[in-house]
Amino acid sequence: MRSKTLIDRIEGEASLYLEMAQGRVAKAHIAFPHFRGMERILEGRKAADALVITPRVCGICGHAHLMAAARAIESAYEAAGKPIMLSPKAEAIRELTLVLEMIQNHFKWLYLVILPELSKLGIGGLPQTPLKGAFAASLATKVLALFAGQWPHSSYMLPGGVTCDPTHLERVRAVGMLDELAAFFERETAGTPLENILAMESCKSFNPMQSDLGLLEHGLLAAHMHEKGFAHDRFIVLGEHGFSTAARVLQTRRRKADAALVQTESAVCPDERTYADNVRYDGGFYEAGPLARAMAGDVTLIKNMHRRKGASDP
């Protein structure tokens, strides 16, 4: 049996085609039918135009694209023998705003997407509090706006640094809101201080938590979600930041990663025209994203969960 499902909780729209056999997915194809073509739009333009155009490829992670554009231009200068050195302040502001974008995205994804969708699958006992996600995301965005201005499509990064120079009052406001955000996470999401989370080394420490994260884990295990949808058990991180380094992980073995080994090719969907690309590393598919960063960063709790629950552990 074949079925088509529209995927609309992404930036853009995609079609997912599934072939079912005995109640299981036998084949899957995904199509992105709308051409976006930022790389085509940039052809023939001045390099600085990328700082404005590239972030608009996505309303969810514009800061990541802005940083990629700024770094690409800086790399071009370096290749031309004119390296650009960032000041420690500019580097710190770039890192802070990028992390804040990730944080607000994670809060929205958890409370506005994951928990409601899992409840639709019949997993009971999960918190249905979408306003928690909206509140936490707004706090992160307010801090981000102090340094980057408008959100989501900020253009405050330039080759060599940033356009902002935060005042003492702005820094104090940022620290206050960050403290409020951390306290919210500890109270509502984790149910325990951050120090306790970071010190955990085993699933056994996580299981008794009566918090939104604890209830989520209980629901996922009760529904046997950790036994479904196994991937290749290969993870990759290519971004070089204060919180991550380029690496790949095969099961639990950490290896070096070289961006030169990334290959792209046009994807094929037999049911619909698609403008997507398949991306491989040295010929193989790898998982990227938050789990990959935790695995490559040797986060003990996450690696323990992965080892005990398997490669599909959400």
Q: Which residue ranges define each predicted feature?
A:
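Active-site bordering "gate/hinge" segments
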Residues: 1-314
